[in-house]
Amino acid sequence: MITLTHVLGSDIPHHNLTVLRFFNDVLAKCLPVEQVRHFMVAAKETAPFSSFPQLDINTYSDKKALAEAVIARAQADRSARFFWHGQFNVTLWLALLSGKIKPGQVYWHVWGADLYEDAKSLKFRLFYLLRRIAQGRVGHVFATRGDLIHYQQRHPRVPASLLYFPTRMDPALTAINIDKPLAGPMTILVGNSGDTTNRHIEALKAIHQQFGPDVRVIIPMGYPANNEAYIEQVRQAGLALFSQDNLRILTEQIPFDDYLNILRECDLGYFIFNRQQGIGTLCLLTQFGVPFVLSRKNPFWQDLAEQHIPVFFYGDTLDEPMIREAQRQLAGLDKQAIAFFNPNYIEGWKQALALAAGEHP
């Protein structure tokens, strides 16, 4: 049996730990060790990895060191196969483009930012062009329905399969309907992180225009680190629209259970990033019967529609009765059948890893 090496090529602690936890706690119990055990991870902080005894994790101090190790292994053994989980590592894309890594060696699971080209500088525009070419040279691509449609417009000949990120969810909560209070001001969650792709200030202005100053707004901004200047910009913009009592900015990473309690309080989510992003938060809101607003440029709306989940589009007319009706629809939805919920996404991972390991034609 072919041994797969899983590559987490950027130091993104939250996402990387979610993947590692899923492999250690779930997949290691039901799949051959050759498919799930071996990882190469870019990480400065390695202490959390001691919680994953079922995995063999080689760590590298930065993206370049990891890429050099992957390239060396790929060149030394052309039968070696790598499963890339997201890929924000320039050196790896250039290695694939130059032939140092061969297409048949790479199986790639797309993460949100992988396909999108937001930066405007000449340097990034050149990189985007090269990356786009390289992305057409992988052996197989895995992604959400919306991202697959986006990808296959550029690379129709590359084999592709549906696969969802292993969002951390408690399946026991899926069957519980949470009653929303119909009186009092609504609570709205804005964005899924402190990243500028959330367009927080634009979202706050739209919320104020649609619902007035009396709604409560919660903005999670505990990630990324060293983001104080942007957080302060968002705070000042928010205070110009909402009272201090109605504006809550979360500037620290918070425990998972505390985050769930915050999501339960919400009546609406507001996510206007122009790409696939924040699927974990969208899943948790759906689990708790909370509808949300998305940009039409976020292709994940196609996955939501496929699962009959109501969604509002940014820029459309929106009022409180429409939100209450969407909450009613979500309460009546068979959430246990949603493809990207835990445990339903596990079967997709079993199929993906078997395919990457050569167990399927």
From Swiss-Prot:
**Topology versus the membrane:** Peripheral membrane protein
Q: What is its EC number?
A: 2.4.1.325
Q: Which reaction does it catalyse?
A: beta-D-ManNAcA-(1->4)-alpha-D-GlcNAc-di-trans,octa-cis-undecaprenyl diphosphate + dTDP-4-acetamido-4,6-dideoxy-alpha-D-galactose = alpha-D-FucNAc4-(1->4)-beta-D-ManNAcA-(1->4)-D-GlcNAc-undecaprenyl diphosphate + dTDP + H(+)
Keywords noted in UniProt? Cell inner membrane, Cell membrane, Glycosyltransferase, Membrane, Transferase
Q: List the disulfide bonds.
A: none
Task: List the lineage, top down.
Answer: Bacteria, Pseudomonadati, Pseudomonadota, Gammaproteobacteria, Enterobacterales
Q: What does this protein do?
A: Catalyzes the synthesis of Und-PP-GlcNAc-ManNAcA-Fuc4NAc (Lipid III), the third lipid-linked intermediate involved in ECA synthesis.
Its annotated compartments are:
Cell inner membrane
The highest taxon in the source lineage is Bacteria
Mind telling me which Pfam families this protein's record contains?
Glyco_transf_56
* Major enzyme class: transferase
Which InterPro entries would you find in this protein's record?
WecF
A single BP term in Gene Ontology: fucosylation
- Could you tell me which pathway this protein works in? Bacterial outer membrane biogenesis; enterobacterial common antigen biosynthesis
Q: What is this protein called?
A: TDP-N-acetylfucosamine:lipid II N-acetylfucosaminyltransferase
Organism encoding this protein: Yersinia pestis
What's one GO-annotated cellular component? plasma membrane
